[in-house]
Amino acid sequence: MNSPLQILHLEDDPADAALIQSALEAGGITSATTRVQNQAAFVAALERGGFDLVLSDYTLPAFDGLSAIALVRARWPDLPVILVSGTVGEDFAIESLKSGATDYVLKSRLTRLAPAVRRAMREVAERVERKRLEAQFIEAQKMEVIGQLAAGVAHDF
């Protein structure tokens, strides 16, 4: 990853935020991170846009990771969201993925964070390329139909 990833990080604990930033750096992820601590700041940052990735704690005062995912999906459906949680059970993992999380990482296993970020960014790039190719294919089909119509009209004269 050449240019720094623009990361929106929803985390209320400064110590956890520092550990997560260190894990990204140790994993070779260069980032420009905007850290917010509550729903209002999160919504304001989302509205400004320009982020490549969202990292979100699951449990925050008066706000949670699933609500954060819903806010992201409403405005930026293709923006990857990785939940980073201190505690996670199987039910949480399933619920978060069904809600639209790209991945989840335990705070006790932050060595998984950089690979999860790389995978999420690779999936975004693949999705963008697939959409580009689909648009190209549709355009080619339109041109083929126009060519057939033009040939039919020319034949009639």
Model-predicted regions and their roles:
Residues 4-5, 12-29, 43-128:
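N-terminal membrane insertion elements
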Residues 153-157:
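Hydrophobic face of the DHp
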